[in-house]
């Protein structure tokens, strides 16, 4: 079957004119030759590494630029979006006037006009009923490569019938000279228009803006249909039992969901509808700082031809120095999901989840390694999205820095966080799923909970052993803590026992509880949030 491609007239409909050439849904072979052309310079240029993957630099933007994110406020979005300038919660959904949007669109279309363009049509979402058909337009070969890796690649038959629901125009080379007069944050912009179904990118070359941009849009569209939209990894066992893992960076989400006994559904973004859990993506976007073949063989072995490395140091002989974080600690690789062997095939979807795991790395040494959550506690801890890391101070003292990120992904939420919590709990109740809070952080010994014990805890959750054991109630946080689990050091299960003096735990617990309560105050501007206060710590 022939693929129809895209005509200059269609591009003109978006405001892009006089295009020299359209390279439609290029093959990996063509992208490889395009992005490694010797004539390319700066951020456009790709370097071949000895692993077979191409490496690129994203310039000064080595991560997302949340302060430059905007959504057009109009009749469609006015009463649905969780706006940065309304309510108690702080978020990145800054409103944009239609007039400013029109100006930004003019900048991007002018940048893309008269050029040789790459157009990639792809799906966001593995379920045909709810997926977004997205058209990406860019003048940069490796950006086309990035979205080909990260999104779901349609068949020729699907491309022949492809009518996009959403357009992403990446004008990374253009900036906004009028930003100050328009009251914007900088000359760079990542702007969305839900009425026009379009994303505009200017000034930033970071590939993740396209990935997370579409995640933000799924986070708007799906919950309004009663479908859970989740920043999580997911896997499935031999008996078809599905588990989802929520957690912020550094909590062990990727490590713990990569399990030789279970097949990976996906590593980052999922939906949960009437049929079950499904991946939004067709690829993985893994951190590579300090990556080694011994510690993370799956990711290391996925870095081969067709993978795309970002901001890594490549030595003159083509060797990649994964330990070098001089450009950024956020070095990354994108690759198609089929670079991982132990995955769900042919479509990244499975049945309903029966286990929902919230991962936190508590550096305060307060939370138990595992606790069973009630439905109300599930919503409370989902909305809290807590983790903490140890940050060194000038005097060498390490003190915990707490992070609270709603739904373990506040940066990507487009609706009020309570809407995601309500949809998740409804899905869990319909499936009879249970939720657990797993602390991969520290305890009273001053040491981090061992990966051996954490894996034992995850096994006990997945095989049901945790439901068969007695529990005690941990005061202040009111959490149900198991008294014994197979393969797990019993002495660590009650965090109070890891302190020489239990009053030390109590003092730290009260401090952390106050932080939880203060953070949760921002959700009390809705009846749903106010009702959940009693599921939190008791002071």
Swiss-Prot record:
It catalyses: oxaloacetate + ATP = phosphoenolpyruvate + ADP + CO2. The keyword Nucleus does not apply. One of its GO terms (cellular component) is cytosol. It is found in: Cytoplasm. Mn(2+) binds at residues 212, 231, 268. Binds 1 Mn(2+) ion per subunit. GO terms for molecular function: ATP binding; metal ion binding; phosphoenolpyruvate carboxykinase (ATP) activity. GO terms for biological process: gluconeogenesis. Its main location: cytoplasm. It is an enzyme of class 4 (lyase). Belongs to the phosphoenolpyruvate carboxykinase (ATP) family. Involved in the gluconeogenesis. Catalyzes the conversion of oxaloacetate (OAA) to phosphoenolpyruvate (PEP) through direct phosphoryl transfer between the nucleoside triphosphate and OAA. HAMAP family: PEPCK_ATP (MF_00453). This is Phosphoenolpyruvate carboxykinase (ATP). It comes from Photorhabdus laumondii subsp. laumondii (strain DSM 15139 / CIP 105565 / TT01) (Photorhabdus luminescens subsp. laumondii). The lineage of its organism: Bacteria, Pseudomonadati, Pseudomonadota, Gammaproteobacteria, Enterobacterales.
